[in-house]
Amino acid sequence: MNKLENPLQNDVAGPAPRHRTTQVMVGDIAVGGGAPIVVQSMTNTDTADIDGTIKQVAALARAGSEMVRITVDREEAAAAVPHIRDGLRKLGLTTPLIGDFHYIGHKLLAEYPACAEALDKYRINPGNVGFKAKRDTQFADIVEIAIKNNKAVRIGANWGSLDQELLTKLMDENAASAQPRDVRAVTREAMVQSALLSAARAEEIGLPKTKMVLSAKVSAVQDLIAVYQDLASRSDYAIHLGLTEAGMGSKGIVASSAALGILLQQGIGDTIRISLTPEPGGDRTLEVQVAQELLQTMGFRTFVPLVAACPGCGRTTSTTFQELARSIQDFIRVEMPSWKTRYPGVENLNVAVMGCIVNGPGESKHANIGISLPGTGESPAAPVFVDGEKFRTLRGENIAGDFKALVIDYIEQRYGAAPKPGAAQMVPAAE
């Protein structure tokens, strides 16, 4: 049997080195060039609804989105953009705003200069920026406005709106070839060429690489991986990752995580968006949470303390550990906005909530603080471990409440400037 080769040729588990890209500043956020991978999201409000859009951008930003894209599809939306920016500033939010333009972006940016100034980045789709003779002119118009306003641009190809003239040309060339390629391979090549040719044209007009981000989105996982591998191998532009039309619920989460996870592991990607179709009335911020969890799970960034919990089995017929894990997870999410300033570094905390004696003590020892709750037929006692050492054993009807109090004490003492007066010290209790 052949031994699987480790491409890193050492004992360190981790991703491949990051693909070297040119850094782009979007507002005050650095994208590419070795900067931390950026989480972004997009609103689904009518941008002309100023109050509604401010509310959703604020929710996305507070959930952790570091950039937010908004649709600018008509005059009313373009006119609303400066007011949205100003409303966010009044809330103390400086999250960069990205304008998503299709078909008439050149017209809106020219006729609404306040919109062009208020946005931090313009997204151009080379497949619908213009058609025939108008395409190059309208593309140039947007690029020149970006240069004038010192704004970044994302050139985002999408196979749902691919440049048909370019695709037809490549398909005809392929049909005439002695060894024709698969149609999907030709489509992928058209995606990559669309992005790269547009970027080259933007540079000719005067937009530097330090102002450009590229993307090439498809909705099929394997095609997406192939497209981005090709794009990265042929350029050093900053890269935006995303699986378009990923879908709803678990399907969308799994598809996006599978595709982006593979690319990130290969060192590809400078900013990501998880494009989820929300349930009717669902929480738009879920896409931000999933993006953060993907990056944190893979070890690229830390956003919130991690809560490890066992999946449960026949040994854990009690729901106590499940309820406690959920309670701790929800508690952390609610408290993180204030914890970020009060307890620097708290995002690195690891908590374990385990359901029985099999893996409970061992997993708890690997966490900063962990608890092993009793499984079916086990003694009604729950040992707590702090930094790998047994700390105390909780008993009685309020194990969940007692453990949460210990978590709070641990955070205050490890990450606070000084323990709160009267706060319980992390001193092992006599058993």
UniProtKB/Swiss-Prot annotation:
Its EC number is 1.17.7.3. Belongs to the IspG family. [4Fe-4S] cluster binds at C310, C313, C356, E363. Binds 1 [4Fe-4S] cluster. The keyword Acetylation does not apply. One of its GO terms (biological process) is isopentenyl diphosphate biosynthetic process, methylerythritol 4-phosphate pathway. Its cofactor is [4Fe-4S] cluster. The gene is ispG. Keywords: 4Fe-4S, Iron, Iron-sulfur, Isoprene biosynthesis, Metal-binding, Oxidoreductase. GO terms for molecular function: 4 iron, 4 sulfur cluster binding; 4-hydroxy-3-methylbut-2-en-1-yl diphosphate synthase activity (ferredoxin); 4-hydroxy-3-methylbut-2-enyl-diphosphate synthase activity (flavodoxin); iron ion binding. Pathway: Isoprenoid biosynthesis; isopentenyl diphosphate biosynthesis via DXP pathway; isopentenyl diphosphate from 1-deoxy-D-xylulose 5-phosphate: step 5/6. It catalyses: (2E)-4-hydroxy-3-methylbut-2-enyl diphosphate + oxidized [flavodoxin] + H2O + 2 H(+) = 2-C-methyl-D-erythritol 2,4-cyclic diphosphate + reduced [flavodoxin]. The keyword Nucleus does not apply. It is an enzyme of class 1 (oxidoreductase). It holds the Pfam family GcpE. Converts 2C-methyl-D-erythritol 2,4-cyclodiphosphate (ME-2,4cPP) into 1-hydroxy-2-methyl-2-(E)-butenyl 4-diphosphate. It comes from the Bacteria. It comes from Rhodopseudomonas palustris (strain HaA2). InterPro entries: Dihydropteroate_synth-like_sf, IspG_bac, IspG_bac-typ, NO2/SO3_Rdtase_4Fe4S_sf. This is 4-hydroxy-3-methylbut-2-en-1-yl diphosphate synthase (flavodoxin).
